[in-house]
Amino acid sequence: MCGIIGYSGPKQPLPILLGGLSRLEYRGYDSAGIAISDGENIIIEKKEGKLQVLKDHLLDSKIKGNIGIGHTRWATHGVPSDENAHPHYDNNQDFAIIHNGIIENYAEIKEELQKEDYQFESETDTEVVAVKLSRQWTGNLLETVCKVAKELDGTYALVVTTTKQSNTIVAGRMMSPLVLGVGDGEVFLASDSAAILEHTNKMIFLENGDFVEIKNGNYQLFDINMNKVTRDIQEIDWEVSEAEKSGHDHYMYKEILEQSEVIERTIAGRLEVGSEEIPIDLKKAKQFEKIWIVACGTAYHAGLFGKDLFEKVLGVPVSVELASEFRYREPIVGENDLGIVISQSGETMDTIAATELLKENNSHVLALVNVVGSSLARMADSVLYLHVGPEIGVASTKAYLGMLVGQLLLAKHWDESNKLETTFNEIKQLPSLIKETLKCEAQIKEISKSINEKKDIYFIGRGLDYALAAEGALKLKEISYLHAEALAAGELKHGTLALIQDGTPVIVTASQHHLLDKTTSNVQEVKARGAYVIAIGDNSSKKLQDISDDYVTLPEASEMLSTIVSIIPLQFIAYHVANLNGESIDQPRNLAKSVTVE
């Protein structure tokens, strides 16, 4: 959620910090700040609001130094304000700290420090740590940070520098992501590799409990007891251009348009029987007695799609679980179960906690993630990477499509009897099918003009189409701020039909041929109440086309692939409705790209 950037090396830190913070804007934030040290003094500049406010403030700045740290804050303790923005000083301005996550026992620590007459300028838990570092200074920054960290409860990542030990940065990870970028005589820190990718593709993903001491462009890793540890350097194969808009107005729009290209990477090398790119083969898959799919938000909706596929090909029960609820209801998980955890970032805190529960019960854990080296990738027994490149827009598009395709690939490799009724050769044509489906944009743009001022919009579908409807509704509400609700079409008569009135938009996904008659009957029900119906399907149902106000025709394909590409019109609807209403598409209010707190 919050963003961290740090630098040590021969260059001036300010432009590197501001550039890194720019690449972290997509994570969501309400204020931003930087701290730069020349070895004798630490200068902090921070502002509430967008990063541009800070940039304008620093326009004529002549701040110079040897090291620097920067932060974008997402308010948890204290309102958004200049005072609560990071970095924070201690009382003597000897220490500067930035921090992601939550210090759960900060109030008790603060109370103890106040009894000793320490003062606080902000409402944050972060400043409490800065003051405690000053209070417990041992003469060595690494030692002091490790000592204080042992007294902190919570999940967090922190980065500290001090005038008491010049040219030194110490950072630590406690369940909140932190990555070290290794350059030529320079070292970078970030909460997300995308922030430093323009400087280096050599990354070290810190493990929980890792601390790093950075001096003069060099680094050394330690555990919390100051024992040296080593971690492998991983080379990230993302291109810097993939994290840029490439001339488009919004990242989300660019990411919708590039789905044909990125899905080609998702399927590459995975279409041959026995491919080593598939982490669990059929023999092993047949040994599982139950499958748990655990995820949040968009990834959860992708899991709804996977449930039907895996039950069909393996004949075992599949349960799709919200990660935020999973570990609190004492699920009956066994050692012969497979846990499939899905997350674009691989850092979703609730999903990480759910993964720990699965592993405690000796289940085999398979992670579907996009970010190489992420926490879930390292925790899992097996990994299937999505390979869709960096996704910057908060509203997931290409990563969601990658999740659908990733699960389809797994299911097809486990499909002994072709129960999915699709072939590897057909899946190979998916990038071309996506490209053809993208041509619906002009029609969607016109349709969007009919619904962008509506207050309530409903999405319906049956079977796999319901899974797509759920994601379509989420996309619309998270970037347009319109109320959108998805439901299985057969549930309309159990309550929601009471809300349908003249002009109410109802968006129908209808790719499941065996359910077309039932879906069409549900559409007739809402039409009878005056609904404005937008249907998405192929040429299989003239009746549905005839009763719909607008019908988006999908390219000819197998039923399974038609279902997958149905999401593209829904993505376009969300984008163009939000754009017509002038909303902040890439950074919707109150939302963050990667939810790294519980």
Placement of each model-derived feature along the sequence:
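Active-site phosphate/pyrophosphate-binding segments
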Residues: Q259-I263, I267-W292, S382-P505, A578-E598
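Acidic/histidine-rich
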Residues: T155-E186, N452-E478, H513, T520
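Glycine-rich phosphate-binding loops that contact phosphosugars or nucleotide phosphates
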Residues: K283-Q429, R462, T509-P555, I573, ...
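Conserved short alpha-helical segments that host acidic/polar catalytic motifs at enzyme active sites
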Residues: M1-K245, D249, E264-A268, V273-Q287, ...
